[in-house]
Amino acid sequence: MALSERLQGMTVAQALAQRATTDPEGLFLVVDDHRVTYGQVEEEAEALAAALANLGIEQGDRVAVILTGCAEFVVSLFAVAKLGAVLVPLDPRLSPSELRYMLRHSEAACAVTVEIFDGVDYLQRFEEFFPLLPELQYLVTVGEDDLWYDDRIFQFEDLVSAGVGRHFEVSGVRDPDDLFAIVYTSGTTGKPKGVELSHRGLLHAASAAAQAVGLTPEDRVFGVTALFHVFALGPGILGTVLSGASLVLQSEFDPVSALDLLELHGVTVHYGVPTVFGAELREQRRRPRDLSALRIGLVAGAPMAEPLFREVEAELCPRMLSAYSMTETSSIVSVGRADDPQEKRMFTAGRPGAGTRIRVVEGDGSELPPESLGEIAVSGPGLMRGYYRQPGETARVIDPEGFLRTGDLGMLDEDGYVHLVGRREEVIIRTGSKVYPREVEDRLHAHPAVWDAAVIGVRDELLGEAVCAAVVSVEGAIVTAEELKDWCRLTLADQKVPDSVQFIESIPRAGTGDVRRSELSRRVGRGERGPVT
């Protein structure tokens, strides 16, 4: 039976239960030297769900999970699914104000959290949070310590042990279109929004990615360190379950240990953002590993520049695919295929998966013909239910026909492949002409002395907006701003050539790989390392 057919009527909890029934001894998770089977995750998730139910957590309650790449995150995800509750995955790196905002906005009744992360004591942080978050009833901690004097705080292992063999009831019918997760956007252009995703949507995205890379039970998957991200939830965790593959986890990304894991475990499928593959490429050149098992990689979150794409295929992973993903579409919108020619895999974001429809539209919503540049609009099973507690914002972005206005500019070619240009709000208007940052960035990335680059518009009295390039040079390389401008003039129209070039230590990016352009603007405004023009 085709994978898409198996998904009919399936929920997230049922996906794991089916896999654990058919292959209980199959290897699901590899964390350091710890191996966890599908049967073990099913048993622990069932026990944790029972323990949470005994505390009063019920269907529809929001459960925040604030963990790194660990088995406890995966167990928590499926426990929430079994309860019919709603998962709220959050980044442990969030500032106290960001974390408090998301916990309050989601109305989380319970939080599963790391105890210590990057020097931050989360037990201390939540002691401060409790009086400010009246909806928050319980805290479940993953670690060694325990606040024994607080009856609202429990250790993860204790709850799992307490729930073994305990029966729990879930009222109501679990439907694939029920709300399963509220995933917060990265907030690169404003306050984060809570995106409501269904069981069906996440499983659809998982299926699309699994089919694109040809996942099988023999595969070992790597590259979903940020488990709180929508790509990790769908293609990462659920895609692995649907295929019966194994998932190799890393608590925090580090290129040295990442390549060691790829070699040690014979990883065959690698997901990641461009910066991950770039860091691994540099490390592989420094100390080569045997990566002969690696057969395919999938890059999402942000486009990969042509030079890096070619180098990764030549030196790291023999076949790379590109995907277009958004939180609002449960991750995958379109994805390349292994049998696509290299030009399509490199310069496009592939084609929409089964059931997904893509239009390119004018500002008034009218559909444009192929090869026309406009705003990408998407509909299909992966589309969000809406923004949590923001009906006005939901109505603004989803039209009456059920298409999401993504804010991304691009086109569909005659073969149905998606070409991305950039975000609508990122377009620079220089003397009345539109300049798309992606086009200039691609040209800069092609220079051998440029490691990374991002382009923004800055206010200018004469030009309206000037084109400013922020550049990270290759270590040891010497290049000037004028050289880079001349390089751009070889292929770009005059109005697209950067008016200024500023060399900086690093490009600020979100975990998705997207440039944090507001932060970059502040750095450029401060003259970090001094402008070179």
Feature map (PLM): residue ranges:
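AMP-binding/adenylate-forming catalytic core of the ANL superfamily
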Residues: A50, L94-R104, A111-E115, H270, ...
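Conserved AMP-binding/adenylation subdomain of ANL enzymes
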Residues: L203-R220, F228-V269, E283-R285
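Gly/Ser/Thr-rich phosphate-binding loop
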Residues: D158, L264-G272, L281-K344, R357, ...
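ANL superfamily adenylate-forming
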Residues: F117-P176, E283-Q284
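Conserved AMP-binding/adenylate-forming core of the ANL superfamily
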Residues: S4-A13, E25-C70, V74-F78, S95-R100, ...
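Conserved pre-ATP/AMP-binding loop-to-beta segment of ANL
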Residues: G9-M10, P24-L27, T141, D146-L147, ...
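Conserved ATP/PPi-binding loop(s) of AMP-dependent carboxylate-activating enzymes
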Residues: R351-G355, D364-V397, V435
